[in-house]
Amino acid sequence: MPNPVSSALIADRWAQGPSAGADPLDSLVYLSNLLGREQRLVQPGGGNTSIKLLLPTADGGSVEALLVKGSGTDLRTIRREGFTRLSLPKLGALRHADSMSDGDMMRFMAGCMLATGPAPSVETPLHSLLPHRVIAHTHDVATMSLTNVSDGVAERLVAELFQGRIVYVPYSRPGFPLAHAVSGMADRIPPTAIGMTLAHHGLVIFGDDARQCYARLVEVADRIEEYLATCRRARQVLGPARWSVPPPEERRRAAEVILPAVRGALGASDRVILHYDDAEELLTTLAAERTPELVRRGMTTPEHLLRAGRLPLWLELDPGAAEDATVAAVRSQIGRQRAEYEEYHRRYAAPEERALDDWAKVLLVPGVGMITAFGDKNSALTANLCYRAGLESLVNAEAVDRFQFLPEADVFEFEHWPLERRKVEETIAQERATRLLPRSVVIVIGGGSGIGLAAAGRFADAGAHVVVADLDAGATEKAVAGLAGRFPGRMIGVAVDVRDDSSLDALFRKTVLEFGGLDCLFYTAGLPPRFAPLTAIRREDLQRQLEVHYLGAVAAIGRAATIMRRQGRGGAIVASVSKAAVVPGKDAVAYAGSKAALLQALRVAAVELGPDGIRVNAINADQIETPLFLQFVRERAAGRGVTIEEQLETYRKRNLMGVGLIPPEAVADMAVLLASEKFRFTTGGYLTVDGGLPEAFPR
């Protein structure tokens, strides 16, 4: 499969690295970062490295220690503190154990730790039982291609390619079983060996130092890649094209309909965030005749079972079908494949063992692309990268001989591996306990400043993925830059003009293609009031206020509702109105009229969208400390011939609680609550954030 991940052999990139006399741990960090940045070698979060060192002890002595990549760290970004330090003499007891449960293994390793740090990696036993000083373990495309065939073929090819320098190890489950298996074949590993290929589990390379280990790894991976290239040239694996590859604009229009339907179908218990990939070479592979049959044979490494699922879903959709028919087809085909999954689950599950909610992480749609689903954008992107690497390995393995993954029973065991399922379940439980909007997608229109900017941060704090949209592109960019560091992968900015239908279309399209759908629209776009008596107001003043406060809002709500209906999981629409919507004010016909129109539109929307589970509510905020309100204060003060401070005092005195300027976060908090399950029975509502203005009380 043509793929940018494997477009060339791996280049040796050590040139700018530490010299031979550098600190050994610094050199290991550099090695790890090099591996982590090379997606042909390691996909995000995968792989592990280690070094054995003599460390000083508090009593002035020393201890032989294993420093190994800690659980939850990433080779691409790991630093010195990311390596767990363990006592090698204590770890040596593993040699004498015939079996060990995962729980016992983790407790044993915790007792071997020399200092606080990340929990030991599940591959720590393997690193500890191998005698070599520096070890690197990768899930590289080349090795996975070579070892996802029968044991007999894989072992023969490894022997032919490396003449004993690389040893083939049949599959054992990662953790203690793999370490025990390798320990048991120690007498078959010649002293000249520089590494091992692990069936379905990648490459392990040894070295005296980090530089040597890296050089050997590049050499081995490239030697395998050269062999694979000859196999690809000799055998046409995928066959002729069966499906067409539409132009980018056409397939993305289709994806706009398909993605929300997928998101709704997969998000029955917990919502998912989607990543969409329509790269040309990927679509060419999906269009091939044999691809559907090949991808149903499985993944290429247990690591990818965790990150990309057991099997991809395959959707065949009619490009000429109406939108409603496409949504129905997506739901039907996913439902059928869910039934197949449940049948597989019944074949191997214990009586009380539940089928997984996160059973499907990859969907392949010929003519459209690949969709990956996870609890957050970064994890969905990781699933994409893992499956891209796996798909290439699958095609390569078929060119070598015949692609063959693990037996179904082993796949089930790994999918339900308690050590990993516990992490997933704890993450979900923590999300539910601490976040009001986990895994949600929210658009904030007017998010560049004031209430909208505060809301963008509050929605993200609540667990949402947020699209910050504003007319001011610079403000949007600044808002995202200020928030993205706290919420990596969960914040994008889009410039939008709500007076322009094509601009609104682009905003909602970008949201769907980026995150897969939409759960909440918060509309807080606004213009400063244009004060003038009825006898002097101009038509263009009325139109300008209506365009933003009413017409733009209605257009945005309609687009949001369309996406939410495709998902079929309800949703929330919240808009910031104003006291002026219900309280007449002198010279405010343009502003008050537009806000009153917005409030009535929200009530109509609540009536129309309620049967779809879409809730629509309004917030009446007054004297909020925003640039827009402060401009309003200046204009009012000038019109009355008073100071700004005197004008603000007037506002303070008129509310029952006697509060001055209200922070925009107070409105943002209300918006988050209205969007959340806390208000799941509330629609058509009108809540105030104003300190108590009797004339603005809802009637």
Question: Predicted regions span which residues?
Answer:
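Glycine-rich flexible loops
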Residues: 1-442, 454
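Short C-terminal tail/terminal secondary-structure segment
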Residues: 531, 683-699
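Substrate-binding pocket helix/loop in short-chain dehydrogenase/reductase
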Residues: 532-534, 538-543
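Active-site helix of classical SDR
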Residues: 557, 594, 602
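Alpha-helical segment proximal to the catalytic Tyr-Lys
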Residues: 562, 607-608
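Residue(s) in the substrate-gating loop at a strand-loop-helix junction
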Residues: 578
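Short, small/polar-rich loop/turn modules that mediate ligand/substrate recognition or access, typified
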Residues: 610, 615, 682-684
